[in-house]
Structure formats: structure tokens, C-alpha cells
A protein has these predicted regions:
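Bacterial lipoprotein signal-peptidase II cleavage site
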Residues: 24-35
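Extracytoplasmic small-molecule ligand-binding "clamshell" domains
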Residues: 47-51, 56-126, 273
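Extended ligand-binding regions for polar small-molecule ligands
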Residues: 87-96, 155, 163, 168-169, ...
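Ligand-binding cleft/hinge of the Venus flytrap
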Residues: 75-76, 90-97, 178-199, 229-233
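Acidic, polar ligand-binding/catalytic clefts
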Residues: 100-164
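Short beta-strand-to-loop elements that line the ligand-binding cleft
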Residues: 64, 100-107, 172, 193-202
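Periplasmic-binding protein-like
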Residues: 67, 144-151, 226, 230-268, ...
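A ligand-binding cleft/hinge motif common to bilobed small-molecule-binding domains
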Residues: 109-110, 127-134, 181-184, 211-244
Length: 291
């Protein structure tokens, strides 16, 4: 009887001890697993929605831009701070994508080559979409802008249309659609009385040529020509209204399909929430809005 009782007590204690050890081990396992199943803390950053976009893996969008084309992109006088419509729009897109935006000042005439060499992820530099450019790179349309003719105040040559430039000296930035326009004009309507087309690396140099009398007109995007006139203290004016309006496009390499999709989504978001219209208004470019 005593031996049986001792055995019974031993078995009972063994069962209790086994249960205690099982509970203890279970607690340890639960404590180790807790961090993987815990709900995220309010306000904690979430996984980036563009994590599968190769160009954005480092958390930045690298933008190539010729930052000498006010009010689209320019440096604040005496600083290295880039400003302008394209700058603000790129920043708004970056905010939607959850990435920082970094700008690289790049000469316009070589900017497509720089993109193809992967010096940046995209071009945002008042680039008009053309069939020729579209053969090299892809675009996302984001504004609609035409061309303007900038002349000396009072319009001493009486220029009213492109054809009135025949036989005159005209300054223009190299690599722009305006240079193409002038070359086409020389091959067509001005073939018998060709213009002397003087090209410059940047638009401000073309404008200075007009100011010192080396040219009678400058062709540039209409908002840029208008800004040049407004900043000239009455020395310059724009002839009439813009003509040949066409889309500006964000330029991308053709293989950047994921980035293009992400940017298209971000652009739609800033249109939907009013940011797009606000940025246009900030720079007096309401007429450039895409429908």
C-alpha cells in the first residue's frame, strides 16, 4: 500500500511538473514570436509602394534638368537653390512616391544622351514631346506649352509672324524645338531670304544677344519668353500669343517601365488632390494645364 501510494504520488508530481514545463516553454515561444505578429505602431513608416522600381531603390529620383529656363527651372539669384514649375512639380511627384528628388544641371542639347548614359532617372526640363524624341525615349505628358517670339520693346522690325523673320538674325537655344522651327523655315518659306540663326547653349545667352542688338528676335517657349520680357525692365516684349502648343513630357528610358507606371500614378494623384493646379497657379501657368 505504501509502495503504491509513493508511486501514485510520484506520477502525479511528474504530470504536474510536465505541465509546468510545457506552459513555461509555451510562454518563451510566444515571447519570441510576438515581434513578428505585433501590429504596426501608429505613425510608423510603411513599406514604400515603389519598392519594385529599380531606379528608386536608393530612395531618390534623379532628375536631369537644364536649370536656366525661368520660370520653368532656374537658380535663385546668388544661390544654388533650384526653383520653378518643373522643380516644384518634380518635388510633388517625389512626395507621392515617398522618395527624395535630386536635380542634376545638364545642358539641354545633350540631355537625352545623359539620360541614356544613366546619369539620371528622368528628364524634367520643359522638353516638348516630338516624334523624333519619342523614337529615343518615352514620355509622360504633364503640360501644354507653345512658342513665343521675343523682340525689342516697340517691335522695331514689325514682326507679327514667323515668316516676318526671313532675312533677319534670330537667336535661339541649341537643341530646342524652336531651333528646328527656324531651320524648317529656312528650308521652306525663307528659302530665298534665309535667316541668320544664331544658337546658344542656354536661353539667357540668346536673350542677351537680343538685348545688345546682335539679333532682332529670340524664339523660346511662350512662358519663358514672357518671363524674359517681364524681367527686362521694359526693354523687351513678346509678339502676340503663343503658337504651336504641344505637350511637355517627363522623359524616361524605354526600359524604365516600372518607373513610368509609378510616375503616371503619382501624376494622377496630384491632379486629383489639386496639387497640380496649385503648382501651375504658383507660376502663372494655368493655361498650360493638361485637360
Amino acid at each position: 500500500m505504501k509502495r503504491w501510494l509513493q508511486r501514485s504520488l510520484f506520477l502525479a508530481l511528474a504530470v504536474v511538473l510536465a505541465g509546468f514545463l510545457a506552459v513555461a516553454c509555451g510562454d518563451d515561444d510566444e515571447e519570441e514570436a510576438a515581434p513578428t505578429s505585433a501590429a504596426p505602431t501608429a505613425g510608423a513608416p510603411t513599406a514604400a509602394p515603389v519598392a519594385d522600381v529599380p531606379e528608386l531603390e536608393d530612395g531618390t529620383l534623379q532628375v536631369l534638368s537644364d536649370i536656366a529656363y525661368a520660370p520653368m527651372e532656374f537658380y535663385e539669384a546668388g544661390t544654388n537653390e533650384a526653383k520653378g514649375f518643373d522643380i516644384d512639380l518634380a518635388d510633388a511627384l517625389g512626395e507621392k512616391l515617398g522618395v527624395e528628388v535630386e536635380f542634376t544641371n545638364t545642358g539641354f542639347d545633350g540631355i537625352i544622351g545623359a539620360l541614356m548614359a544613366e546619369d539620371g532617372d528622368v528628364i524634367m526640363s520643359s522638353m516638348t514631346v516630338t516624334p523624333e524624341r519619342s523614337e529615343e525615349i518615352d514620355f509622360i505628358d504633364y503640360a501644354n506649352v507653345g512658342t513665343g517670339i521675343l523682340v525689342a520693346s516697340g517691335n522695331p522690325e514689325g514682326i507679327a509672324a514667323l515668316e516676318d523673320l526671313c532675312g533677319l538674325t534670330v537667336a535661339v537655344q541649341e537643341g530646342t524645338i524652336q531651333q528646328d522651327m527656324l531651320e524648317d523655315l529656312n528650308a521652306g518659306a525663307c528659302a530665298d531670304n534665309q535667316m541668320d540663326v544664331v544658337t546658344f547653349d542656354q536661353n539667357p545667352l540668346a536673350v542677351e544677344e537680343l538685348r545688345v542688338g546682335g539679333a532682332v528676335a529670340v524664339l523660346a517657349d511662350f512662358p519663358v519668353a514672357l518671363n524674359d520680357a517681364n524681367e527686362s525692365e521694359g526693354e523687351l516684349e513678346v509678339v502676340g500669343e503663343q503658337f504651336d502648343a504641344a505637350p511637355y513630357g517627363i522623359g524616361l528610358r524605354k526600359e524604365s517601365t516600372e518607373l513610368k507606371s509609378a510616375l503616371e500614378g503619382a501624376l494622377q494623384e496630384i491632379k486629383d488632390d489639386g496639387t497640380y493646379d496649385s503648382v501651375l497657379k504658383d507660376w502663372g501657368l494655368e493655361s498650360a494645364a493638361l485637360e
